[in-house]
Amino acid sequence: MFDLKITGGTLVDGTGTAAYAGEVAIKDGRIAAVGASVPGEAAQEIDATGRIVTPGFVDVHTHYDGQVTWDDQLDPSGGHGVTTVVMGNCGVGFAPVQPGKEEWLIQLMEGVEDIPGTALSEGITWEWESFPQYLDALEKRHTSVDFGTQLAHGALRAYVMGERGAKNEPATPDDIAEMRRLTKEAIEAGALGVSTSRVLGHRAMDGEPVPGTFAAEDELFGLGHALRDAGAGVFELAPAGADGQDLVNAKREVEWMKKLSAEIERPVTFAMLQNETEPNLWREIMDESIAAAEEGAQLYPQIAARPFGLMIGLQTHHPFARRPTFKRLAEENTSIEALAKALQDPANKAAILAEENLPADPNNLFDGMSDMIAVMLHRLYVIGDPPDYEPTPDRSVAAIAEANGVEPIEAAYDAFVAGDGTNMLMMPIFNYVDGNHEVIREMISHPYCVSGLSDGGAHCGMICDASIPTFMLTHWARDRSRGDKLDLEHVVKKQTKDTATLFGLTDRGTLEVGKKADVNVIDFDNLKLRSIKLVHDLPAGGRRLLQKAEGYEYTIVSGEITRRNGEDTGARPGRLVRGAR
């Protein structure tokens, strides 16, 4: 007898082949049978008539490194059909750590990934020093989602080199040898890869760039050679230029990545986004990735399935946050509804619009966001509820201002304070230069590009892209109206088999016999994203943006139902996923 059988559904099996009517049977946490009709009884049966059945989604770009130590649901990813997450990206993580340097790693993560430091300080248990000890601590965790991690270069460099590493001083041959040894040790203990950041905008709360940002080639190759030594692992990075800065070096990055991958015979995956300064640079990099394959390299650009940018509202960073009248009203009105009502008063509006910003706090890395947003209002869009991530030009704040005969700053003010004040506007920084998704469609369609950059668990106060797996289905396979859609089978494969295969997780990602029973049953016709909300549910009352979905009828991990109609069941089959051992 099977443990569970899913009948009556349309199987989109993750291989990219055409969807078909079929059944899936599960036994002992594995897929035991798949076919048009599977004979045999089951202890439990799910009627999936009118639903699609997919593999669980594998999200390879998250930052749950701290959250996984206290949260057993791993929201928001768990609510979007994700059954496996990979963390430790962008060169930041929490192991190895020198005793007494825990808070330094926290302020590094807070600065780079906008995760409240107070939440990390209260939530992380710090049961480790070395990376293998970190994995052993994680192995004790039982969650609703499987999780794997990479070794972060930033933490490793600071551990080996101390203050010299933290301050980005050059590594000596002995430093490199030790980092190589510890990287090999981490891979052999189960790390899925090693990650680094070379992005100038990735900075700790103390203003210092991530350790390794300026690492010389011999240091980077030392990390890569450790992967070759261990015979496993992925080299992941946020390359120079990925944030729109340092674009000269962005073109050089591909050369060393190509050389490294061919030399170590391991995949290299890196963030790739379209930027406004050189809007065709991404295509040059993608073409280089194709050419690299002919030279024995494995380069896989990680791409975002929608515009990559900020969510702006009264509860996040916005242009008025440092204006005296706004600050006073925010102190007097503790609820967002009361604050919005006060801001709707014409006298208060006039006062705020007439004021200058107070000086930014030099000790707060994010306090200057108000100024940045104010000069980028031409990129700000009203996206509505439910959110439309491909808004037409007339929905930009600039266009609304022109139509109403006011300045953009006033149009932005009116949009922020409307209703109950919880509105979120979108400010795309990348992937929306032309005001549509055609570039993104080209990226997703490319065989070497990997779906990623959701940043689940990170950018808590500004970005909310952990819902991308759902968006891939609703927008690209069903709802897009301003251009061509993508086949459902392709969209599912992009975030199941393709992502799992990149990180060597070949036991999952498809609905095939013997594979891990990670499955979604989805009401595809009614699948939708809800509006983005700000909640204070992290340790110490830390805030984060959440976006829930409707339409996931069942999410199954290792054969156990973890979500039913979007609600957590309490099942905790999720475990640490170790790589080569």
Regions found by a protein language model. Name each.
Residues 36, 90-92, 199, 240, ...:
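Short, ordered loop/turn segments at secondary-structure junctions
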Residues 364-365, 438, 442-449, 454-455, ...:
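C-terminal cap of metal-dependent C-N hydrolases
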Residues 134-138, 144, 150-160, 167-173, ...:
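Active-site neighborhoods of metal-dependent hydrolases
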